[in-house]
Amino acid sequence: MLLNPLFAQLGENRHVLVGFSGGLDSTVLLHLLVCLRQQLIPELNIRAIHIHHGLNPQADSWVKHCMQQCDQWKIELKVVRVNIDPRQNGIEAAARTARYQAFSANLAAKEVLLTAQHLDDQCETFLLALKRGSGPAGLSAMAAKMPFAHSQLLRPLLAFSREILENYAQAQQLQWIEDDSNQDDRFDRNFLRLNVLPILNQRWPHFAQATARSAGLCAEQEQLLDELLAENLQQLQGPDRSLSIDGLLQASMAKRAAILRRWLASLGAPMPSQSQLQRLWLEVAMARQDAEPQLMIGTRQVRRFRQHLYLLMPLAEITTNYLPWATVKATPNSSIIPLLPEPLWLPADLGVLRFVSAGGQAVRPATVGEEISVRFGLQGDIKIVGRHHSRQSKKVWQELGIPPWQRERIPLLYFGEQLIAAAGVFVTQAGQANENEPCWHLDWDKQLKLG
């Protein structure tokens, strides 16, 4: 009953990583895979991963149980200890986030991830989404198959109830862990499992199957919207994946909200609440023109610049505004261009600056005795190449179309106290290379990271 559906769901996949807690569900899944390897797919490569959350006094004994079980079934087991930070969304959400981060970090190149959620879990997920006031995306609950990390996540037991899994485990004389925290109904999921679903199932024995059908219909509607809005989203996005506010203004309120959700999802942001979506539009997109509005969605920041919305990753803090680079020393032959300094690693994951033989920004060479440094935070009046007059630094950034959050993170090259260039953006008249004379070429590699 369980083996053939699992065989069908695996398809051509022959390398699997199984989330193995040692509980009933994951024990059944792992046993089924072992049977599959023995009976149908001898080349099936199975690895298991156990996440030690450090939340239960018995956690170490659970690790021992999982190791013994995997040793008996000749399965490689990876045990990963994680740190849980419950401050933002509570223990349940924090544990889940840490768990899936560990899964992602340990998923090998050819592997797919398998987890053991079942029909009752799907029903609980649907009801929790209903309690939160979720729309069709949230009410879609859990997908049986979805992209994950560089691969896929499969939930092959999603159509089967816990009762079916328990009957299978008992028939196969399997041993599993009972987590005592599952009896604590202070947690929402446990409250549903212990106090609500038994009553619903007693009145309506097929309640879980019905909610699963509703979740499937919601998922279909979301997929249809994805297909219908894909072209609109593409048209409204710039090359930098920013989103046109003017384009959004042409859409109805419902369509605009759907496009915003898909834009955020495409960039890896968590699904925003209805309240967050309203704030995004009213407080960021529709803020007065001279404002610099921002809104946090999870750990990401939504900003506005020139009638476009941007979703920013968390930015590492720049803790110093001054970086000494080198002091130019005399060469044996004064007619020879001074030696180029070694590359300079920048703080806050900003990459590396270096002088190269060609390409980059052409600047005059530093003279003997000049100290080369890099600074952050442009101030004062600036006269750049190609402009006849000095301009205030803020005006320069505005004219060049540099968003406010990037301005303080652009390395500024100085020779002595003279500003020579803003890396990748402009060269000042003080830094201009003379025609037909030797010059240096400044290159900023933003992708290269130290370590």
Swiss-Prot record:
UniProt main location, coarse: cytoplasm
Catalysed reaction equations from the record: cytidine(34) in tRNA(Ile2) + L-lysine + ATP = lysidine(34) in tRNA(Ile2) + AMP + diphosphate + H(+)
Gene Ontology CC: one annotated term: cytoplasm
Organism superkingdom: Bacteria
Species this chain originates from: Yersinia pseudotuberculosis serotype O:1b (strain IP 31758)
Annotated disulfide bonds: none
Gene3D superfamilies, per the entry: 1.20.59.20, HUPs
Binding site for ATP: 21-26
Keyword Ligase set for record: yes
Protein name as it appears in the record: tRNA(Ile)-lysidine synthase
HAMAP family in the cross-refs: tRNA_Ile_lys_synt
EC number(s) per entry: 6.3.4.19
Similarity remark: Belongs to the tRNA(Ile)-lysidine synthase family.
PANTHER family: TRNA(ILE)-LYSIDINE SYNTHASE-RELATED (PTHR43033:SF1)
